[in-house]
Amino acid sequence: MAKQIQLLFRASYAIEAQLLGADDFPPLKRELESYMQSKNTFYGYYSEGNLAAAMEIDARPKSTHIQSLVVHPDYFRRGIGRALVNFVFENYTSEVFTVETGAANGPATELYLKCGFEERYKYNTDHGIRKVRFQKQIKV
């Protein structure tokens, strides 16, 4: 299963690297062992018998961070990303939800804004990639 997840992440992140104009994109270098040893929770979305999307969740008592949300390019623009974000909102009772993406990743930014996230700040990574952090506060 970890190998399927790794292949899916690489297919999706290859597109994001192009969108960001990134020559050195760390998610594309993630080793198989990293998926297998992760303390985070992974969820998959299957379509037509294929792993079409997946997300990695880092859940804490008061906050839930969507560490990664990827959709295979063959399944782009089908509402799968929104379905996964909604799954998180429905299944985690956090006060705060966060997610990050490359600042130039228009499709991801659009998705997160439509799902009720608000931009909190932008920053530059050590690899020269401009990122944006989004947050959604849940009223308790």
Question: Which positions does each model-derived feature cover?
Answer:
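Conserved beta-strand-loop-alpha-helix junction that forms the acyl-donor binding cleft
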Residues: 76, 99-109, 125-130
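Conserved beta-strand in the GNAT
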Residues: 44, 50-58, 65-70
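Conserved GNAT acetyl-CoA-binding A-motif
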Residues: 85, 91-103
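Conserved GNAT-fold acetyl-CoA-binding loop/helix
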Residues: 6-33
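Conserved acetyl-CoA-binding loop-helix of GNAT-fold acetyltransferases
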Residues: 68-71, 77-90, 110-114
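A short helix-loop-beta-strand connector motif used in the catalytic cores of GNAT acetyltransferases and
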Residues: 32-44, 65
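Conserved acetyl-CoA-binding loop of GNAT-fold acetyltransferases
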Residues: 113-121
